[in-house]
Amino acid sequence: MSAPTSYNDEELEELLRRKAAQEQKRLEEERKRKAELESQKESILRVILTPEARQRLTNIKLVKPEFAESLENQLIALAQSGRIKVPITDEELKQILEQISEQNRRDFKIQIRERGWK
């Protein structure tokens, strides 16, 4: 009785090894794909931004990576659609950042309602 069990254990171990190898391969392919996309994005940004503007974007990325990612995507989309002149200077990037900041500002109002607690 124990012989079939050990055989099944060996099959199970082999199956687990194969699954782990497949998962590792999938993760490696995904990592390569992301690296390639990031490289393409950096290449596009080198074309559409002046060195000073790229430096400002890099500084933003250090402090607010999610915001910088969104900004990069927006800049690329604007440049590819022809809605913004290329290359974008540091001053133009500052103006874009100010516009985004104004759009994102929200007025918070606190209303205090008096209730009679009995």
From Swiss-Prot:
Q: Which GO terms describe its cellular component?
A: cytosol
Instruction: Give an example GO molecular function.
Output: DNA binding
Q: Is the DNA-binding keyword given for this protein?
A: yes
Keywords, comma-separated and alphabetical:
DNA-binding
Q: Could you say which protein family the record assigns here? A: Belongs to the PDCD5 family.
Q: What is this protein called?
A: DNA-binding protein YN1551_1057
Species this chain originates from: Saccharolobus islandicus (strain Y.N.15.51 / Yellowstone #2)
